[in-house]
Amino acid sequence: MKDSEIRKAVREGYGKIATQGNSCCAPTTSCCGGAGIAEAVSKTIGYSEEELRAVPEGANLGLGCGNPVALASLREGEVVLDLGAGAGFDCFLAADRVGKKGKVIGVDMTPEMVEKARENAANGGYKNVEFRLGEIENLPVADNSADIVISNCVINLSPDKKRVFKEAFRALKPGGRLMISDIVLLRELPESVLNSVEAYIGCLSGAVMKDAYLKAIKAAGFKQVKVVEETTFPIECMANDPTAQAIIESSGIRREDLSTLGESILSVKVSAVKP
């Protein structure tokens, strides 16, 4: 697929999620926990009950693969930039930590997501959070303006990950930090999955090898690049997800082989510093 086709597919896929409330990367029935699937998935990947209760209703769509805010060591007064902010879940958690003197900027390329995030911010009474429409490869933020860049299961969706990391580097102040949670590969995916549009939207075929991912961060200029945590991605929990069903149908993968495919996939939490 061409880069423009990938972006169009991702934008349309996440636009539907914003309006329908279904996760592309999480189950919609009882595979991972029955009712309140977004909440169940979020608990599985590291969010506490307190964090889930602290955000406006509808902010958590169950789209993440980790909890970057918990690992970011945010301080009062800091400026936080969230790449691929979605409905604002991590932004709202970050806003509580940086306080009234701080600021959180969420960037997303999907108009429906930005609209939903702004509605959530208004409903929650957040004054220190701003959502901007834009691509993470071309961030609508000034140079040297953020203290920390966070992102949660989004950069894997970009067809130009090197550009994303360069943009994150540009946006950070000297001494600024990067803390991201994302999906990477331990081994190459089957060709049928790599060529699946549905798999790309579902956070699968856009993922790259772990070493290549870390090299891209270093190539952007970051130092102290460190994998803080890594866990296997519970892809078998996608068996009832509409996107997962589309992946199965379009790629020919048998449902029972999903867990085997999951052995190729990691959720990693990576930190780095702009010197």
Segments the model singles out, each with a brief description of its role:
Residues 15-20, 32-33, 218-275:
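C-terminal lobe and adjacent flexible extensions of AdoMet/dcAdoMet transferase-like proteins
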Residues 34-79, 89-97:
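Conserved alpha-helix/loop element of class I SAM-dependent methyltransferases that forms part
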Residues 76, 137-148:
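A short acidic, Gly/Pro-enriched loop at the edge of an enzyme's catalytic core
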Residues 96-99, 162-177:
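A short glycine-rich, Lys/Arg-flanked "PGG" loop and its adjoining helix->strand segment in the class I
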Residues 110-112:
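Conserved SAM/SAH-binding beta-strand->alpha-helix loop
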Residues 124-138:
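Conserved SAM-binding strand-loop segment of SAM-dependent methyltransferases
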Residues 184-204:
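Short, glycine-/aromatic-enriched active-site segment of Class I SAM-dependent methyltransferases
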Residues 205-221, 225:
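Short alpha-helix
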